[in-house]
């Protein structure tokens, strides 16, 4: 019985150490904005998009721009 409690405490400790949004939803199929940007041929840039590209959105959580040629 003590082993069960020990394992339960260890699992709770491991989950409490994770940062919010560590990838629980991403691993279930939800994709990040950065992933979507890259999949659609864009690239993430912290400054404004170059003149030969256009703004497609953001690459959260840092909110850099998603630029596409």
UniProtKB/Swiss-Prot annotation:
GO biological process, one term: positive regulation of flagellated sperm motility involved in capacitation
Subcellular location: Secreted; Membrane
Gene3D superfamilies, per database record: Antimicrobial Peptide, Beta-defensin 2, Chain A
Keyword Mitochondrion applies: no
Listed GO CC annotations: extracellular space; membrane; microvesicle; sperm midpiece
Recorded GO MF terms: CCR6 chemokine receptor binding; identical protein binding
Disulfide bridge positions per record: 37-66, 44-59, 49-67
Signal peptide: 1-21
Superkingdom to which the source organism belongs: Eukaryota
Keywords tagged on the record: Antibiotic, Antimicrobial, Defensin, Disulfide bond, Membrane, Secreted, Signal
Record flagged with keyword Disulfide bond: yes
Tissue: Detected in kidney.
Primary localisation category: secreted
InterPro entries attached to this UniProt entry: Defensin_beta-like
Propeptide stretches in the record: 22-32
Oligomer status and interactors: Monomer. Homodimer.
Purpose: Has bactericidal activity. May act as a ligand for C-C chemokine receptor CCR6. Positively regulates the sperm motility and bactericidal activity in a CCR6-dependent manner. Binds to CCR6 and triggers Ca2+ mobilization in the sperm which is important for its motility.
Family: Belongs to the beta-defensin family.
Protein name (database record): Beta-defensin 1
């Amino acid at each position: 019985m003590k082993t069960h409690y020990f394992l339960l405490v260890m699992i709770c400790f491991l989950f409490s150490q994770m940062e919010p949004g560590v990838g629980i939803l991403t691993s279930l199929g939800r994709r990040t904005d950065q992933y979507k940007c890259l999949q659609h041929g864009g690239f993430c840039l912290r400054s404004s998009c170059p003149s030969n590209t256009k703004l497609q959105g953001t690459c959260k959580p840092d909110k850099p721009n998603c630029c596409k040629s």
